[in-house]
A protein has these predicted regions:
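Membrane-interface helix-loop junctions and terminal tails of multi-pass membrane proteins
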Residues: 1-213
Length: 213
């Protein structure tokens, strides 16, 4: 029988795989551009939450897990386990997408200055993570949590995708970057932006003392 830690790790691997597979596929092949990407990520994160959220919490995102540590819902040891699972799921999803569909190996340069991308990622991730921290403890929302999180993610991608790419997720940026030449050179921008936004969201949530009932 699988231990709780293994079950949680597998759930995060599976959920992150679904999210990155759907989002990366839409980004590479969908004709509708940003709208298709937003819907792919938003709908998939909602499905993932309903599918395995009861096992691991349905993070699928190291930034979300980082915020959960700050809020006291996850230990640092659990955080490390979650992140390994999330990065593994993202990398495997990228492997599948690139093997099946193929893609250019040339990385597109940042469309704007790095600090602009970081600023957008901080703000977008802040809103996303704060929403998750809040709704995940609102018992009256019940089964609507997945829909709210998915809708929020889709809306934020539409809002910032044209500027920063709207990653909001270090794992989501990591997987595809492994298979695109020179893309890892810009990875730090997304890691810094998303983790900073998540940390600020968690600190704000704790400072405000948002009620859990």
């Amino acid at each position: 029988m699988l231990t709780q830690s293994v079950r949680r790790g597998l759930a995060e691997f599976f959920g992150t795989f679904m999210l990155v597979f759907a989002g990366t596929s839409a980004a590479m092949f969908a004709a509708d551009g940003l709208l298709a990407v937003a819907l792919a990520f938003g709908l998939t994160v909602a499905v993932g939450i309903y599918a395995v959220g009861h096992i691991s919490g349905g993070h699928f995102n190291p930034a979300v897990s980082f915020a959960m540590v700050i809020d006291g819902r996850l230990t640092w040891k659990e955080f490390a386990y979650y992140v390994v699972s999330q990065l593994g799921g993202a990398a495997f999803a990228a492997v599948v997408v690139f093997l099946i569909g193929g893609a250019s190996t040339d990385a597109a340069p940042l469309a704007v200055e790095a600090w602009v991308v970081i600023a957008y990622e901080v703000v977008l991730t802040y809103v996303f993570v704060y929403t998750i921290l809040s709704v995940s403890k609102r018992k009256e929302l019940g089964s609507f949590v997945g829909i709210i999180v998915g809708f929020t993610l889709a809306a934020l991608i539409l809002a910032g995708g044209a500027v920063s790419g709207a990653s909001l997720n270090p794992a989501g940026a990591f997987g595809p970057a492994l298979f695109v030449e020179d893309a890892l050179a810009n990875y730090w921008v997304y890691a810094v932006g998303t983790l900073t936004g998540a940390g600020l969201a968690a600190l704000t949530y704790k400072f405000l003392g948002v009620p859990t009932e």
